[in-house]
């Protein structure tokens, strides 16, 4: 699964939503990062400890930079944007920020304000794709996607919003 683990994201764009004009994509596209952020929020542990746990569980690579620096997720976003909007993939143009700088105290403040911290990618026609750490309202569908799950929210005309959620880290999800 090159994009979004166990979610058939490419097939959804090419077949399921082919009759729509896609206007935006948003998603959690790296299960490793989502696992780390979810665990930090739920346990209060710091980044390094949760990363080590993710490596032990097989969710993170021994050299995790590609994941935790947002590069893997940005590549996936760029591929989806190219398919959705009929544009040439241009990873170099994407704005990319990972999760290394998120601290345990950030979750305390986010929760007090009614938000959840997630690594989210957003793309729209004619705009620079962005993969960055975001504050999402707790009521947001993407804010409710936890653990190793990935999610892609497709926006199109006439369909509106379609959300797909599935496993995004670990051998089973990434080999499907």
Predicted regions and their residues:
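Rossmann-like NAD(P)H-binding beta-loop-alpha module
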Residues: 2-60, 71-72, 79
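Short coil/turn connectors at secondary-structure junctions
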Residues: 19-25, 126-127, 149-150, 158-161
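A short glycine-threonine-serine/GTX helix/turn-capping micro-motif
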Residues: 23, 61-69, 164-169
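ATP-dependent carboxylate/acyl-activation modules
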Residues: 139-176
């Amino acid at each position: 699964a090159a994009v979004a683990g166990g979610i058939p994201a490419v097939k959804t764009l090419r077949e399921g939503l082919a009759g729509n004009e896609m206007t935006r994509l948003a998603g959690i596209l790296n299960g490793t990062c989502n696992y780390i952020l979810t665990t930090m929020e739920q346990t209060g542990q710091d980044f390094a400890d949760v990363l080590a746990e993710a490596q032990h569980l097989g969710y993170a690579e021994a050299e995790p930079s590609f994941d935790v620096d947002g590069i893997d997720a940005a590549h996936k976003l760029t591929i989806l944007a190219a398919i959705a909007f009929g544009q040439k993939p241009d990873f170099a143009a994407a704005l990319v920020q990972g999760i290394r700088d998120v601290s345990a105290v950030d979750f305390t403040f986010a929760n007090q304000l009614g938000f959840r911290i997630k690594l989210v990618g957003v793309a729209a026609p004619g705009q620079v794709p962005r993969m960055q750490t975001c504050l999402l309202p707790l009521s947001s569908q993407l804010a409710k996607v936890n653990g190793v799950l990935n999610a892609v929210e497709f926006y199109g005309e006439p369909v509106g919003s379609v959300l797909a959620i599935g496993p995004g880290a670990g051998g089973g999800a990434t080999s499907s």
